[in-house]
């Protein structure tokens, strides 16, 4: 009985050792400290580029406080994007109708004479 308990304990220790050496850790290690990416995000590009501290900058100026580009402030970009999306949807609808043969029964396009006649 004592041999079985001892064998189980030894096998558990060996399994734990193998998983640790192969990189398969059971519990993830806690990450600590600052990385360049986290410092750059929190402090902003000005602090990283010129190596100034927070006291020199008088506060945080991270990405959250940076002004947006002017392209994104205007609504013209959004309208243009919506027009492109509508054009693509219309084209795909046309292709689908053409595929199922629904366009064959429609008359051909109108000529300029037919448009000018009331």
Swiss-Prot record:
Its main location: secreted. Residues 1-19 form the signal peptide. Disulfide bonds: none annotated. Endocrine hormone of the central and peripheral nervous systems that binds and activates the G protein-coupled receptors GALR1 (galr1a and galr1b) and GALR2 (galr2a and galr2b). This small neuropeptide may regulate diverse physiologic functions including contraction of smooth muscle of the gastrointestinal and genitourinary tract, growth hormone and insulin release and adrenal secretion. Strongly expressed in brain and stomach, moderately in the eye, and very weakly in heart, kidney and gills. Not detected in liver. PROSITE patterns: GALANIN (PS00861). Residues 20-30 form a propeptide. GO terms for cellular component: extracellular space; neuronal cell body; secretory granule. Keywords: Amidation, Cleavage on pair of basic residues, Hormone, Neuropeptide, Secreted, Signal. Pfam families: Galanin, GMAP. Belongs to the galanin family. One of its GO terms (biological process) is sleep. The modification Alanine amide is found at residue 61. This is Galanin peptides. GO terms for molecular function: galanin receptor activity; galanin receptor binding; neuropeptide hormone activity; type 1 galanin receptor binding; type 2 galanin receptor binding; type 3 galanin receptor binding. It is found in: Secreted. InterPro entries: Galanin, Galanin_pre, GMAP. It comes from Danio rerio.
